[in-house]
Amino acid sequence: MVLIRVLANLLVLQLSYAQKSSELVVGGHPCNIYEHHFLAFMYNSSGFMCSGTLINQQWVLSAAHCDMENMHIYLGLHSFKLPNKDQKKRVAKEKFFCLSSKSYTKWDKDIMLIKLNKPVTYSTHIASLSLPSNPPRVGSVCRIMGWGSITSPKKILPFVPHCANINIVPYTVCRVIYRPLPEQSRTLCAGVSGRRIGSCLGDSGGPLICNGQIQGIVSWGSDPCVNRGAPSIYTKVFDYTDWIHSIIAGNTAATCPS
């Protein structure tokens, strides 16, 4: 019941956030209850919400711009109306960013690693997602998911996460649409050409999954969401795997790739 009351507050407060605050799955469909066991729902009492990805029993990967005070993290959650018996609530014990100042740009270092206050036990609805062994190829079919708005510019938040398939597209496509993106960045460009399918308000920090691995983190996109079929920008997880492994191993002074 507490979570349902929280959602009611989120529905009122979250809709007032600007597009830059957080990203949604537009043009998708309700996820199967068994396909998102690694998906984390993150929120606070102020109405800010994001997603994250469980990468082992005590660590969640998300976007740096999803950092918030008094962060609550739900794992094993599917429906706000019908909670799973094995869903768990955690808080952040520690947060790690690529820069000590927590600064990032739209095209670089939008990544946050969260250590939970205590590990979760894997169950029917809770399990981790693998980090990438190789970067994704252009043309790869990937999966996005989250509790973000399912329409734009009008914001409608669902009671269950929505999923959609999108493609990795050439980075040059995003450079043309989103000027002045640099010639190179540690991001991925992904969407569906000519169709309004993609991430939006409330999905920020969630995973871009290719071949069963987390290849991207929802970072930002157009306003309205997926405007005229525009692709969105995702943090390229493969470029940060060494940093992630180092932090988890206890080397908290590890530096991110330049």
Swiss-Prot record:
Residues 1-18 form the signal peptide. The active site is at H65 (charge relay system), D110 (charge relay system), S204 (charge relay system). Disulfide bonds join C31-C163, C50-C66, C98-C256, C142-C210, C174-C189, C200-C225. The keyword Protein biosynthesis does not apply. GO terms for biological process: proteolysis. PROSITE patterns: TRYPSIN_DOM, TRYPSIN_HIS, TRYPSIN_SER. It comes from the Eukaryota. Residues 25-249 form the Peptidase S1 domain. Monomer. This is Alpha-fibrinogenase-like. It comes from Daboia siamensis (Eastern Russel's viper). The lineage of its organism: Eukaryota, Metazoa, Chordata, Craniata, Vertebrata.
